[in-house]
C-alpha cells in the first residue's frame, strides 16, 4: 500500500485529490495520514469527502477514515465501473470545479454521468467558465472530449450551483505544448447571478479596454441569470493561440467594483501571456496529471507549490520520469515520460 504524508508540500486537499485520481486509474491502494495537518481546520472537510465518495462510487472502493475531521484515510480501489450516474452535493459553496478535476481523468471512455451541486464560482479554485473556456479546450487538444452543462451557478457562501459532466471520451496520447503560437482571438464570459445586468457589462467593458492593446479580436459574452440561490459575479478569459490557450478569471465580491473585476482578470491574462508560457498558472498544475498518464511536455507560467506537490505524489503511483527545468515560482518546462 502506498503511504502518503498529507502534510507534505502545500499540505492541502490537492494531495488527496491527486492520490484519489491516480489510485482509481492505477488500481493501487493508498493510506494518507496527517491530512491537512497544518491548516486552521485540519483533517477532511465535507468537500474533500465528496471527492472521496465520488471516486469510491466510480471504483467500488473500500475505505476507512472517510469522515469529517479525519486525519487519516485508507482507500482501496477496485475495477472502474462504467455506465453509471453519480450525484454529488458538495454543500453550500464547496468547489464544483475541484471535483471535476478529480474525477474527469478517471472516467474517460467509461460512460459515467456526474451531477455536481455546490459552488461553481468560488474563491481558491478555477471558475466554471475557466473550466469551459480553457481546461476542456486544452484537453480537446490532447485528444479528450467532454460535455459540460452548467445548469445553475453557485457563489460563496450560499452555493446552489449545479453542473453535469458527461460523455468524457477520447484517445489521448503523448503531447507537446511548448508554445502558445500566434495569438488569434480572446474569448470570455462575464456573468452575474441575481444581480443587475449592468455589472456583467461593466466587467466586460473594463476587461476589453485593457485587452484591446493586444491587437486581436475580442469576443466576450455576458451571462445574466436571475433567481439563482446565490448572488455573485465574475469573468473568465481565454487567449487563444494557434497551438495552445492561456486563461484567467476573477470574481466579484462585496465592495469590489465591477470595473476592478474585469481589469483584474485582464491583467492576470496579460501577465501570463508575458511569461511566454504555453499554459497559464492553473493549467500548469492541472495538465501535469495528463502528461504523467500519457506522456507530454509543456511550458507552465509558474511552478507553484501545487505543481511541485503533484510531482511528488505522481511519482508514488507511476513509474515515470519527470524532468522539470525552472525554479519556483518562475516559468518552467515540464517533460514527463
From Swiss-Prot:
Signal peptide: none annotated. Its EC number is 6.5.1.4. Keywords: ATP-binding, Cytoplasm, Ligase, Nucleotide-binding. This is RNA 3'-terminal phosphate cyclase. GO terms for cellular component: cytoplasm. It is found in: Cytoplasm. It comes from the Archaea. It comes from Saccharolobus islandicus (strain M.14.25 / Kamchatka #1). The keyword Lyase does not apply. Pfam families: RTC, RTC_insert. One of its GO terms (molecular function) is RNA-3'-phosphate cyclase activity. Belongs to the RNA 3'-terminal cyclase family. Type 1 subfamily. GO terms for biological process: RNA processing. The lineage of its organism: Archaea, Thermoproteota, Thermoprotei, Sulfolobales, Sulfolobaceae.
